Amino acid sequence: MDNKTYEISSAEWEFMNIIWMKKYASANNIIEEIQMQKDWSPKTIRTLITRLYKKGFIDRKKDNKIFQYYSLVEESDIKYKTSKNFINKVYKGGFNSLVLNFVEKEDLSQDEIEELRNILNKK
């Protein structure tokens, strides 16, 4: 899967978080889970499932006449590649610019500053 296909919508993130948490889930399980958080129709959720299936993020297997959906991508991989795409798009690939933007605009606690220092020192 190339980097461009790693762009997913907020709604698709909702779905993927459920799949990563449950490992396997039927469409009805997914619908129930999403409807506890969002006011989406079952048809909308089924469309979302189909879209992610066609994009190659999920696959399905038949279990007693019911499709069980599961992720084809690791959560950490998609988060990394999505973040990388964002940095390339918004910051022209400059990770330094991203960090500087947040450090300058956010009020960081001493603990957060120390944590950043420790991370950088390990590199």
Curated annotation (Swiss-Prot):
UniProt signal peptide: none
Localisation: Cytoplasm
Entry keyword annotation includes Zinc-finger: no
Domain of life: Bacteria
Region spans: Important for dimerization: 74-123
InterPro entries, A to Z: BlaI_family, WH-like_DNA-bd_sf, WH_DNA-bd_sf
DNA-binding region positions on the chain: 7-71
Keyword Cytoplasm part of the UniProt annotation: yes
SUPFAM superfamilies hit by this protein: Winged helix' DNA-binding domain
Pfam families: Penicillinase_R (PF03965)
Disulphide-bonded residues: none
A GO cellular component annotation in the UniProt record: cytoplasm
Record note on modification: Upon exposure to beta-lactams, proteolytic cleavage at a single site impairs dimerization and abolishes repressor activity.
Gene Ontology process terms (BP): negative regulation of DNA-templated transcription; response to antibiotic
GO molecular function annotations of the record: DNA binding
Assigned keywords, A-Z: Antibiotic resistance, Cytoplasm, DNA-binding, Repressor, Transcription, Transcription regulation
Site (Cleavage) location in chain: N101, F102
Function text: Transcriptional repressor that constitutively blocks the transcription of the gene for the penicillin-binding protein MecA. Binds DNA as a dimer.
Assembly, per entry: Monomer and homodimer.
Family per similarity comment: Belongs to the BlaI transcriptional regulatory family.
Name used for this protein in its record: Methicillin resistance regulatory protein MecI
Gene behind this protein: mecI
